[in-house]
C-alpha cells in the first residue's frame, strides 16, 4: 500500500466522519487545525465498469466497482499503518472511515478495532471509501465497441484526437508512471 499525507479539507473530514451537525460541527470546526488525514492507496484488480446511458450529450454514467476480500484486507493493513503513524506523531485518537464512527484511542487497541470491521455484507459497506482511478479509464483496443482509443491512442469517435496520458495504462502503476506517460506522448 502507498500513503499520501496532507491536510484534509474540512469538507472531506466532515463527509468521512459525519462531524457536520450541531454541537459536533461546532467542536469539529474549533478543533479542525488539530486534524490530519492520510490517504491509503492500493492497487485493485480492475473489476469495475463505467456504464453510460442516454445520448452522448446530456446522458448519464454509473460507476460500478466492488472491493474483493483481498483488497479489503490490504486496505485494512493500510489503515493500521496510517493509525500507527498518527499515534507515533502524538495523536490522541484515530477515526476510522466507517459509518459507525469507530475510533481508536491508543496504538495498543488499533489492530483489534480495525480487525473488528469484517468484509461481510455489513463490513465492506460500512467503510467510507473515496475512490479514484488515476489510470486505466480510457481503454485501448482494436475493437471500437470495446475500447475508447485505437492501438495508437487515437479516440475512435474523434478523428485526430489522441490520448497520451496514464489513462491508457492497462492497470494501476505501483511506481510513478511519469516516464511511461512521457514515452506514450
List where the protein language model places each region.
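FAD cofactor-binding and catalytic pocket of flavoenzymes
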Residues: 1-86, 131-136, 156, 163-171
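Domain-level signature for respiratory redox metalloenzymes
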Residues: 24-26, 36, 71, 80-87, ...
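A glycine-rich dinucleotide-binding beta-alpha-beta segment and adjacent secondary-structure elements
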Residues: 92-171, 178
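An active-site-proximal "capping" alpha-helix that borders the catalytic cofactor pocket
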Residues: 179-185
Amino acid at each position: 500500500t502507498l500513503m499520501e499525507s496532507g491536510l484534509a479539507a474540512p469538507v472531506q473530514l466532515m463527509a468521512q466522519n459525519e462531524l457536520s451537525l450541531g454541537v459536533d460541527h461546532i467542536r469539529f470546526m474549533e478543533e479542525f487545525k488539530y486534524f490530519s488525514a492520510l490517504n491509503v492507496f492500493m492497487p485493485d484488480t480492475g473489476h469495475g465498469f463505467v456504464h453510460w446511458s442516454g445520448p452522448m450529450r446530456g446522458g448519464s454514467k454509473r460507476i460500478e466497482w466492488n472491493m474483493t476480500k483481498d483488497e479489503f484486507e490490504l486496505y485494512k493493513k493500510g489503515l493500521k499503518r496510517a493509525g500507527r503513524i498518527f499515534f507515533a506523531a502524538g495523536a490522541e485518537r484515530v477515526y476510522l472511515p466507517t459509518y459507525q464512527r469507530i475510533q481508536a484511542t491508543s496504538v495498543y487497541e488499533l489492530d483489534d478495532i480495525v480487525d473488528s470491521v469484517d468484509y461481510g455484507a455489513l463490513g465492506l459497506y460500512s467503510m467510507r471509501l473515496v475512490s479514484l482511478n488515476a489510470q486505466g479509464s480510457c481503454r485501448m483496443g482494436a475493437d471500437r465497441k470495446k475500447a475508447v482509443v485505437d492501438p495508437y491512442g487515437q479516440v475512435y469517435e474523434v478523428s485526430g484526437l489522441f490520448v497520451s496520458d496514464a489513462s491508457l495504462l492497462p492497470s494501476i502503476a505501483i511506481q510513478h508512471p511519469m516516464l511511461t506517460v512521457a514515452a506514450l506522448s
